[in-house]
């Protein structure tokens, strides 16, 4: 992370203030203040880890995935015979907190800050799937988009989407 001296001074002061305001995390903020003041390039990279770039396309894909799960659950609830599939199978897994952190952060923003798709935050482990899910969701979206009635899916269509 490259910063001017002025930016470093401002950030160091912010960390100093945060340490005074948040005594439980004071040691963490003192460390970060020392890193910024010292201009330690290796440790400054830590500051970048909190920032991610999620493109408009990626944001839309996350939203499309949530819509797809909404359609899956709505369609399932409207079926008269649900015996071929358990409701647990329709549960949204989320994204991997290690490998897909930026998608998980966007999901948490959409559900927590924006208040949308609240029903999906009932997923296990805070929606940390603990395995990468992006590619799986992309395959599922392809199958879902090929269905003629996106919100009136048959049991076979639901199973095809889940098995993609």
UniProtKB/Swiss-Prot annotation:
Q: Which domain of life is it from?
A: Bacteria
> Which InterPro entries does the entry link to?
UPF0304_YfbU (IPR005587), YfbU_alpha-helical_sf (IPR023146), YfbU_helix-hairpin_sf (IPR023145)
Pfam families in the record, alphabetically? YfbU
Query: HAMAP family under this entry?
Result: UPF0304
The entry sums up its family as follows:
Belongs to the UPF0304 family.
Official protein name in the record: UPF0304 protein PM1500
Instruction: Give the species this sequence originates from.
Output: Pasteurella multocida (strain Pm70)
């Amino acid at each position: 992370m490259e910063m001017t001296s002025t930016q470093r001074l401002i950030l160091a002061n912010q960390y100093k203030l945060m340490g005074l305001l948040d005594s439980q995390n004071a040691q963490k903020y003192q460390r970060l203040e020392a890193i910024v003041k010292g201009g330690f390039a290796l440790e400054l990279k830590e500051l970048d880890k909190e920032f991610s770039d999620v493109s408009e396309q990626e944001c839309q894909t996350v939203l499309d995935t949530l819509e797809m799960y909404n359609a899956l659950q709505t369609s399932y609830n409207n079926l008269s015979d649900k015996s071929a599939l358990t409701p647990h199978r329709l549960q949204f897994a989320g994204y991997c907190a290690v490998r897909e952190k930026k998608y998980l952060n966007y999901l948490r923003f959409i559900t927590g800050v924006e208040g949308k798709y609240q029903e999906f935050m009932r997923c296990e482990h805070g929606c940390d799937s603990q395995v990468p899910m992006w590619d799986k969701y992309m395959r599922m979206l392809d199958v879902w988009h090929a269905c003629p009635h996106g919100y009136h899916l048959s049991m076979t269509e639901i199973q095809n989407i889940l098995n993609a």
